[in-house]
Curated annotation (Swiss-Prot):
Location of the protein in the cell: Secreted
Glycosylated residue positions: N55, N80
Natural source organism: Thunnus obesus
Coiled coil: none
Protein name (Swiss-Prot/TrEMBL): Glycoprotein hormones alpha chain
Gene: cga
Source species taxonomy: Eukaryota, Metazoa, Chordata, Craniata, Vertebrata
Length: 94
């Protein structure tokens, strides 16, 4: 096999993409794409501190807006992203 990094195969670089759902009277952009992620065995020292030990640890960065502003489209408040970067992942739970 060729010596090629295929870790992000099928996933484009983190960049601004036009959101066709919200782009009606003007373009609305959102950050989309892939960033760094990896999984590795949990170090024994860290495993001993866990309430529920997990033998695999993962770390990642997500494609997020570096700059954005709020705007309204058809009565809905949306954020129009103007710049993207790979940074801390934020998960929104209901």
């Amino acid at each position: 096999y060729p010596n090629v990094d295929l870790s992000n195969m099928g996933c484009e670089e983190c960049t601004l993409k036009k959101n066709n759902v919200f782009s009606r009277d003007r373009p609305i952009y959102q950050c989309m794409g892939c960033c760094f992620s990896r999984a590795f065995p949990t170090p024994l020292k860290a495993m001993k501190t866990m309430t529920i030990p997990k033998n695999i640890t993962s770390e990642a960065t997500c494609c997020v807006a570096k700059h954005s502003y709020e705007t309204e489209v058809a009565g809905i408040r949306v954020r129009n992203h103007t710049d993207c970067h790979c940074s801390t992942c934020y998960f929104h739970k209901s």
